[in-house]
Amino acid sequence: MTIILASQSASRKAMLEAAGVPFEARSSNVDEASIKRELIAVSGCEVASVLAEAKALPVSLAAPGRMVLGGDSLVEVCGRQFDKPVSRENAAEHLEFFSGKEMHLHSAAVLMRDGRVVWKTCELAKLRVRTLSPEFIQSYLDREWPAVSGCVGVFRIEALGVQLFDQIEGSHFTVLGMPLMALLGALRAEGELPS
């Protein structure tokens, strides 16, 4: 069966393609900022899960009987949650703040059918950002901007972003933006993939 990915994320598409999951992608056009404003004092995993559901819901309602996958990732550093950078200058500010600290990356996924959640999860990866010099930050952004403008942590781990870190704990797929192993198990359990 072909699932619907309620996202245009290149990383999520690439993971599903590489794993052999038949899918089509549709945008959900959810106003993430307005949803986040209402989620005061909520953990990173909870925020990512709410956003994943919000992205999947309109697509699920528009595709009766189909399995819809929503996903979201959220970065927290020192208890502060970060959005995608809005400019190169904002990206540099994020990287300066991240320098020498532990980043928590929450990646959530939800499966919906007919507007109802049939499965959801959120996984955590911990990434230790090395101390970044101002020169490195500018050189990094010279090479990676605007490609990282759509990335909450201002990095693509599969590219130059790997140089930001000293240590990573957690699934590589979680760092890429989707708890893929758990998702594959759920798709098999729901009959969307052969077991």
Curated annotation (Swiss-Prot):
Write out the catalysed reaction: a ribonucleoside 5'-triphosphate + H2O = a ribonucleoside 5'-phosphate + diphosphate + H(+); a 2'-deoxyribonucleoside 5'-triphosphate + H2O = a 2'-deoxyribonucleoside 5'-phosphate + diphosphate + H(+)
What keywords tag this UniProt record?
Answer: Cytoplasm, Hydrolase, Nucleotide metabolism
What is the first-listed, main subcellular location in coarse terms? cytoplasm
Please list the cofactors this protein needs.
a divalent metal cation
At the top level, the lineage of the source is Bacteria
Q: What is its EC number?
A: 3.6.1.9
Q: Name one GO biological process term.
A: nucleotide metabolic process
Q: Which residues form the active site?
A: 72
Q: May I have one GO cellular component term?
A: cytoplasm
**GO MF assignments:** nucleoside triphosphate diphosphatase activity
Localization: Cytoplasm
Q: Per its UniProt record, what SUPFAM superfamilies does this chain match?
A: ITPase-like
For this protein, the record's Pfam families field holds:
Maf
Q: What class of enzyme is it?
A: hydrolase
Protein family (similarity comment): Belongs to the Maf family.
Per its UniProt record, what HAMAP family does this chain match?
Maf
- Purpose of the protein: Nucleoside triphosphate pyrophosphatase. May have a dual role in cell division arrest and in preventing the incorporation of modified nucleotides into cellular nucleic acids.
State the name under which the record lists this protein. Answer: Nucleoside triphosphate pyrophosphatase
